[in-house]
Amino acid sequence: NKENGGVSTARNTGLALAKGEFIALLDSDDEWLKDKIEKQLSVFNQDSKIGFVGGLINKLLQHEEKLLEIPLSNLIFKNYFQPSTVIFVREIVDKIGFFDETQKYAEEGNYFMRIANLYKCVLLNSQVVLYGQGKGGFGVSGLSANLKEMEKGELRNLSFAYKQDFISVYTYIVAVVYSVLKYFRRILIVKLR
């Protein structure tokens, strides 16, 4: 009944209502593959320390490792997780809370960093969703089409991580420079399409 408050508000409503042991997210323009949940739940059974499992949106992104651990130190430089690919233990919501409803862009990066600061996060080397009804990623449509605002959101996430003592000042500076370079690269790619 709440007026459209954006993706974080919608996700938080779902998180607040969730009762199960695991929580999975699904964006409106994505579709889970039929074996997504089964594949990801089996990962939790392999290692009780795992609290968060992501998957791939594209078979072309597959790598040699079946499972790749993604520590916070990696997540600072690249968001490996697309929201519709993730599943995590319910306990995470109790411990870290909800998505930041004041952040409209790159809000999942903030949430995933907060998770990775406390939990073991892994990436399953398997496509688990049909992403965005075929859209081509950043700069194409939806919120991610606004590259400038997405970059501001990413820089906000890095500032948050530094202020929370998740990362050192050195890591913060390197991550900001790297993020800005990625931003200019994205602009170039979009202009050349």
Positions of the model-derived regions?
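Conserved donor NDP-sugar-binding/catalytic core segment of glycosyltransferases
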Residues: 35-65
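Short aromatic/hydrophobic "clamp" motif used to bind/position activated sugar donors
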Residues: 23
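Acidic metal-phosphate-binding loop of nucleotide-sugar-dependent transferases
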Residues: 5, 30-31, 57, 103
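Acidic donor-diphosphate engagement hotspot in glycosyltransferases and nucleotidyltransferases
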Residues: 11, 32-37, 49, 115
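Conserved nucleotide-sugar donor-binding catalytic segment
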Residues: 16, 55, 69-149
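Catalytic core of nucleotide-sugar-dependent glycosyltransferases
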Residues: 131, 142-168
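Active-site acidic Asp-centered loop
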Residues: 26-28, 54
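Conserved donor nucleotide-binding strand/loop of the catalytic core
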Residues: 1-19, 31
